[in-house]
Amino acid sequence: GISRRQQREIVREGADDRNFARFQRAYESRRQPVQNPRIVYQGCPGAYSEQAARNFFGPDIAPIGLRHFEDVFVAIKEGKADYGVVPIENNSTGAIRQIYDLLSHYEFYLVGETTVPVEHCLMAPAGATLDTITHVYSHEQGLFQSEKFLNTHPDWIQTPLADTAGSAKYVAESGDITKAAICSARAAEIYGLNILVTGVNYS
């Protein structure tokens, strides 16, 4: 395992590739399991972090989604949750600096890792087509990861929201066939949206 002091030193040194590799090697191996753990993540049902929580803790858990990354850390600090699930890196943009900053600020411990394949889909309410869409919503990372696809639709107005699944929820609640979201296929199922294009982050 690795001490809290060592983790803090890695965080302070920065979120470059070398230090992220050290973080990956440094996950605490002496984790004491909590019975019926309370688990929080950033996002809405259908978020990739929710899927990560289910991958790591099991499919029968009931993780609670929170609005912001820092809300996850605050919930643990205040004793309202036992574990928080946050993204450390993605293949497109590398290490996520905000998470490193929060780990350093709250002096929390990493206890494990899991990998979630990211396949973004373009989805919209029933009746929508690529021709009806004028606005597309996602987390800023989702928009960035789908840049090549979005460049083929230069007239679409791109609007970042707090998370990918929240974008699906917003579009579903609007019922507007001019609006589309980029997020996971599971989010489309949860919020009743039709998938128009799969794998838009692979374009």
Each predicted region: which residue ranges?
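Domain-level signature for soluble enzymes in the chorismate/prephenate branch of the shikimate pathway
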Residues: 1-203
